[in-house]
Amino acid sequence: MSAPPALQIREANAHLAAVHRRAAELEARLDAAERTVHAQAERLALHDQQLRAALDELGRAKDREIATLQEQLMTSEATVHSLQATVHQRDELIRQLQPRAELLQDICRRRPPLAGLLDALAEAERLGPLPASDPGHPPPGGPGPPLDNSTGEEADRDHLQPAVFGTTV
């Protein structure tokens, strides 16, 4: 076999050198890409760990808030039950006091006429009893004979019981 010509050897050497440079360049790029991927993976892992920690903390905060809200709910429900019991007691008291209130309203409505009656009775007491007189001759302006619409029973009762003014209140 004969040796390849020098030009072919130089071309082959140049080609091999170019392939070697290209391989070295690709290996350098591959190393850089691997470092980049490794750095990104570490950052993603760290970020994932931070997110998991934040998520865990959010879960704990949520659980604490739920516990606090449940406690507030129980306190509020106890307050509502207490207030309902108070309302029931007051409703019962109102129910018991209602007849008395109606009676007091009735008394208040009747007070002015009653006050007038008491004033008239006081005036009658101030005037005092009539002087003794002859039953056959009544005093002028005094009681006269029974009226037509009077019954004999009323006349008998008037003669049996003399009128005495006074208050028993």
UniProtKB/Swiss-Prot annotation:
Comp. bias (Low complexity): 126-135
Taxonomy, superkingdom: Eukaryota
Stretch list, region Disordered: 126-169
Organism from which the protein derives: Homo sapiens
Name assigned to this protein: Vimentin-type intermediate filament-associated coiled-coil protein
Listed Pro residues bias regions: 136-146
Keywords noted in UniProt: Coiled coil, Cytoplasm
Keyword Manganese belongs to the record: no
Compartment list: Cytoplasm
Keyword Kinase applies: no
Coiled coil: 7-89
GO cellular component: cytoplasm; type III intermediate filament
Annotated signal peptide: none
